[in-house]
């Protein structure tokens, strides 16, 4: 999901900026989901790892895109893994901060 400028500014005020290098894992599937993420710079890959270790690509996200929507559900766990394609800067917002 891509967000408008007003929501983008709100995210910047409420969240925490984090930096990741190429190939860093931002989060793994089955991690507890308690925050939304917004891409500020760079690109991230969203994918699922099957039981036999195969990776199924779901999406590539860039600036202005939100991911981690599974955190909107109480006691949710991440259904996907997200990793940095290149150097990435994101904002993370815990649900209670939104």
Give the location of each predicted region.
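Glycine- and acidic-residue-biased ligand/ion/polar-headgroup-sensing regions
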Residues: 34-47, 63-65
């Amino acid at each position: 999901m891509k967000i408008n400028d007003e929501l983008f500014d709100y995210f910047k005020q409420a969240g925490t900026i984090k930096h990741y290098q190429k190939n860093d894992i931002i989060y793994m599937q089955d991690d507890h989901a308690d925050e939304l993420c917004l891409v500020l710079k760079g690109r991230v890959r969203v994918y699922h790892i099957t039981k036999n270790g195969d990776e199924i690509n779901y999406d590539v996200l860039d600036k202005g895109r939100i991911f981690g929507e599974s955190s909107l559900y109480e006691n949710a766990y991440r259904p996907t893994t997200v990793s940095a394609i290149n150097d990435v800067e994101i904002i993370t917002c815990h649900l209670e901060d939104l």
